[in-house]
């Protein structure tokens, strides 16, 4: 394996069931630096302070382009993410954001907090491989995002919502219970709909 640029966006407590702790996650990710043709071509997103994720990501891209001596003008820059990794689907005059490939409660919170809770609906599935504290992490997520209209599914969320009674949180068991008609109405009303979860859900 060899690469021209290595970008580390962040280190989060993902896949704890495999790596056990965040220190092991950090070591594993940083070991990928060995693939670099030039050790200087490393963009460390951990040192980029910006509360807005999109602005932080733009800065990461700018630094990577600079390392590759590519024009930094991002006005004409286009990027199509892989399925489930942030695809934006234009529908009924609004947007569906598809982040169903993978998710972590912390990143869901950070992303959602940048949105207007009165104009955004969240559809969340269980997030896997979080280790022993997975229920607490899901519970914390719902507590932090209590102002949003939220639809949840999955075994973890089914247990967690029992501890957080809220008129804003709705559970659906399966595809048959999926609130399609309601979400279409929200899109037509100009609200964004975020889908976030793991492939397992």
What feature does the model see in each segment?
Residues 1-49, 128-129, 133:
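Flexible active-site lid/hinge loop adjacent to a nucleotide/diphosphate
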Residues 18, 30, 47-56, 60-201:
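ATP-dependent carboxylate-amine ligase
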């Amino acid at each position: 394996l060899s690469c021209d640029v290595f970008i580390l966006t962040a280190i989060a407590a993902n896949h704890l069931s495999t790596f056990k702790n965040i220190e092991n996650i950090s070591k594993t990710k940083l070991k990928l630096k060995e693939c670099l043709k030039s050790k200087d071509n490393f963009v460390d997103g951990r040192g980029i302070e910006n509360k807005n994720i999109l602005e932080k990501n733009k800065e990461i891209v700018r630094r990577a382009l600079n390392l590759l001596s590519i024009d930094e003008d991002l006005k004409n820059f286009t990027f199509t993410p892989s399925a489930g990794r942030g695809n934006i689907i234009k529908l009924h005059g609004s947007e569906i954001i598809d982040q169903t490939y993978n998710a972590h409660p912390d990143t869901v919170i950070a992303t959602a907090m940048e949105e207007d809770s009165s104009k955004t609906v969240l559809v969340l599935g269980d997030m896997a491989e979080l280790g022993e504290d997975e229920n607490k992490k899901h519970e914390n997520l719902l507590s932090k995002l209590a102002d949003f209209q939220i639809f949840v599914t999955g075994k973890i969320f089914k247990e967690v919502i029992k501890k957080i009674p809220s008129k804003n949180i709705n559970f659906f068991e399966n595809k048959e219970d999926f609130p399609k008609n309601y979400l279409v109405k929200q899109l037509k009303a100009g609200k964004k709909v975020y889908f976030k979860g793991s492939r397992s859900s």
